[in-house]
Curated annotation (Swiss-Prot):
This is Uncharacterized protein MJ1185. SMART domains: AFOR_N (SM00790). Its cofactor is [4Fe-4S] cluster. Binds 1 [4Fe-4S] cluster per subunit. Keywords: 4Fe-4S, Iron, Iron-sulfur, Metal-binding. It holds the Pfam family AFOR_N. InterPro entries: Ald_Fedxn_OxRdtase_dom2, Ald_Fedxn_OxRdtase_N, Ald_Fedxn_OxRdtase_N_sf, OxRdtase_Ald_Fedxn_C, Tungsten_al_ferr_oxy-like_C, W-dependent_AOR.
Amino acid sequence: MKNALINATTKKFEIIEKTVLPITWGLYWHNKFETWKYDAYDEKNVFCFGSGVLPVIGGHRLIFSFRSPLWDGFYFSSMGGAGYQFKSTGLNNVAIIGRCENPSILVIENDGQLRIDFIEVKEELKTVYEVSKYILELYKDKNLRSVVVGEAAKRTNMGGLFSQTVRNGKFVEGSEDWAARGGGGSVLYRAHNIMGIVFFGDEKEDKEEKEKAKKIIESYYKKPMSKVVLEHTKKYRYDEETKTGGTFGNNWLLYKEKVPIFNWRMPYIDKEDRKKILEKILKFYLEIFNKETIEPKRWANCGEPCPVLCKKYRNKNKVDYEPYASNGTLLGIFDLYEADRVVKTADALGFDAIEIGNLTAWVFELLDVGLLKEEELNIKKPIFDYKKITNDDDEEIREISKHNAEQAIKFMHNLAENSNDLYKILSLGKRKAAKILNERFKSRVNKIGKKFNDFAVYVPFGDWGEIAPNLYWTPGFFMPFVIQGRYLTYYKPEFNEPEKLAELVVESIKLELPIENLGICRFHRKWLKPVLKELVKELLGIEDIVEDSINLYREICEYNKKIGYPAKIESERVKDLIIAMAKEFGNEEWTKKFENKENVDEYVKRVLNKYSELLGIDWRIS
């Protein structure tokens, strides 16, 4: 494998010949540069990325790793399809150190000879679409792919990385993806002064290796590979049983009345009322989505030739469950057209949709309960009364959704611009902001009897680290593991005994981390699981990819322990979510135990004890 270490200060690069997977590559450099010693925005926070290494359908993701300004530890995030173009450069992995003097675009090209250059950007580019278009105009005749940041990366900890497929000199509608979790876009811009990366070349994929992989898969399944893929990915393409497709189509039906609403207030809303709200979601979200997306087959892939076509789009909006739950139902928005506006704003500004949705929902509730004031944020209070959704007519629901959407859009613009001192604090994230605001508004805290963090939903790490959970009401996303906000957990709608949950989480890690490190789309995990070890052994020479991945997880743990340790759950809302889950899923023993709220600590402690034992790490709460 050919890899490059690029210095953005000197504009020089070094080629390193080494067989190494993308996340392993990133952690290697973070240990080498001892990045735990420095601020997340120090130029020593090496920004790494690499492409998928197995020549299989779904195997061309681009994986980014960095020390996260949010989580505070080592973090990784990935996007679909971009690795398909990146392989044409002849490189497998890249690491960036140093800092450009002025905002720049990194150019990686290979037309027979590898060239790496930087282009200074003098124009005022604010949205991810403007940066992407700027790059496209420069290299329209190339078979390119770009990865860019937006305004959010410049002044907040929540900047993501955006990429859209280009074909014949034009952007492909719906074929776009994000590596947004953890604030990688913020690191790329604020640590290295890089607004975007563009790559293109003429290196070809090894056809012999591709045939070898296909033979292994078809030998196991005794059927054509294309059929294997489609049979195991119907949720993401089209499910005949549900008559819909994609995460947006199916997750509302799967999680039903447990979908997150109103800043995760589900524990305080009667189940029957939540069912009524679900009816509104199915009417104003799912029915419209099916009519405008599923029926006319507005489906695309991420940019690699994949038949699943998981990207569902309508009205120039790519529609996925988590961005729309975060920036729709979580904000009290139940009109899909209004949610479109909010998601498009979050995307244009370059925010991690999950993180900004959770932050906005928190701020909405702070306004609703009086811990923050309208005049301090220059937005109006949201309409955050769930009974108005269960009781009101359709037109009233549209008006409520429009009002909340307008406040969310204003809030996001103000946050991206850091329009006043309060927005500067909020741009740090919920946990850091809550610590500051608890002191600043002590009298309000005393009056209400609750702290700012009591309304915030996040997983803590160390003294300052945090990440917003994925949009699933399930214990696995609230546990303070070595890394959170990824799918290295167990998230089916269940409530298990702590030791059982730990066992399920570790089993998930054994599948999810290998496919992340190999750069494979997790939508292909079902068909891939039985053949993964053989594929990796035959094509990469790695004897046991699962054991290799567990060792990697242990190394991430050791890195993160240099920064902090698992923290107890600090938020009353998160504790209430865990307590309510025990009741929701009929666990009488824990429902009784949770009558004493402090027993949430016991549950978490037991999960981490078993998790540590199974993984051979020390990640316990004392």
